[in-house]
Amino acid sequence: MTSPQTHVIVIGAGITGLLTCQGLKKAGISYSCFERDTSLNSRSNEWTMAIHWSLPLLAEILPTEVRAKLATIACNPVAGIHSGLYPIIHGETGDLITGVPYKDGLRVPRSKMRALCAEGIDVQYGKTLADVAFNESGNGVVATFTDGTLVAGTMIVGADGPRSRVRETAMGDAKLAATTSFPIFHTNMTVCYNDAEKAKFVREKYPTSYLALSERSFHAFQSISSMPDGPDHPETWVFHMAMAWMGQSDNAMCYAERLALVKSKAEGLGEPARSAFMWMPEETEVHKADISYWISQPWNNRDGRLTLVGDAAHPMPPYRGQGLNHCICDVSKLLAGLAGVHSGSTTLSDAIQEFEAEMIPRGKEEVTCSVENGKMLHDWNKIQESPVFKRGFLPMDGHDTRKEIAQAS
């Protein structure tokens, strides 16, 4: 016996929300998707993201015609989806410290990944969630938006990012749902050198990406982001750059002041990091990222009528490349549960209970690990003990990093 009445309200049209909608559409489950931004890629800041252990899950979620385009949005179109060792290098010498193994990895620009996931998905933009009400009968939910729009559904899925409005409803208290600031000065930059020789030089040794760790306890990251005119036109290649160190950021600094600060640190680096950062054009916009986290914990899912996925469920520091992979994993497991509801083989309450019983502990462990890893990677004396050195890019899966460190020492 099927349940064709199922209608899912998805809040947030980031990658996680869009993937949720792709899976629902593929399964024949009705959905509505709402996004507070006014358009798909309305924000100017760009960055790159790594997909590795979750790639098989992503392939299952996407419809065939969208899945076929995955390799075309790779930051490095020459490499596409590939396996190898991710280079972590010594900031001052440029020498390799370690290579972190990965299998079937894909690095993508956020904007292209989001655009791909949006193909064929109906999104209502400019919609900010104001309230969520639950029918006293125990069935159904009503979402109210700031423009007065009311939308009824079977359940609501919060895919609305680290500062999730849906999470506030789930926790019943904005304070309990609030993120904790990770005390780091983290900068992101999108750079085009407009110079073929410079662009080729900074990619010569590490064609896709690298992470440089400095003895002065900061990191410098570079990745190719896109090749607008192809591999044969390096003068138009675009790079994602990042630099970060522990300490509170100064919100009053302008782009030029941040650029000067970043270059002052880059001056003491070895190649290729030194030139990569010192050659950044003076008009480079140096964005400050607000890194925060929330340690996943049980919430009131209202008998399965509310749940969270992705950064709404487990926002984490980005220094082990896990965030997007867990988002994809969440969507995969949620869709499996909702497919059972749609077919009538399980109830909504049971499906969401089972989903959260796996996802919340997984999210809690990964957030805790990512916080620990972020601190260690920005302390030269502790980098070798960090989870990324000990565990690589593998999900934690109940793995106790602290126990492994103790056994190794």
From Swiss-Prot:
Belongs to the paxM FAD-dependent monooxygenase family. The gene is phnB. One of its GO terms (molecular function) is FAD binding. Its cofactor is FAD. InterPro entries: FAD-bd, FAD/NAD-bd_sf. FAD binds at E35, A50, R110, D311. It catalyses: 3,6,7,9-tetrahydroxy-3-methyl-2,3-dihydro-1H-naphtho[2,1-b]pyran-1-one + NADPH + O2 + H(+) = 2,3,4,7,9-pentahydroxy-6-methyl-1H-phenalen-1-one + NADP(+) + 2 H2O. FAD-dependent monooxygenase; part of the gene cluster that mediates the biosynthesis of phenalenones such as herqueinone, compounds that have been reported to treat tumors, bacterial infections and/or mycoses, and rheumatic diseases. The non-reducing polyketide synthase phnA synthesizes the heptaketide backbone and cyclizes it into the angular, hemiketal-containing naphtho-gamma-pyrone prephenalenone. The product template (PT) domain of phnA catalyzes only the C4-C9 aldol condensation, which is unprecedented among known PT domains. Disruption phenotype: Loses the ability to produce phenalenone, and accumulates prephenalenone as the predominant product. Keywords: FAD, Flavoprotein, Monooxygenase, Oxidoreductase. This is FAD-dependent monooxygenase phnB. Its EC number is 1.-.-.-. Pathway: Secondary metabolite biosynthesis. It is an enzyme of class 1 (oxidoreductase). Transmembrane segments: none annotated.
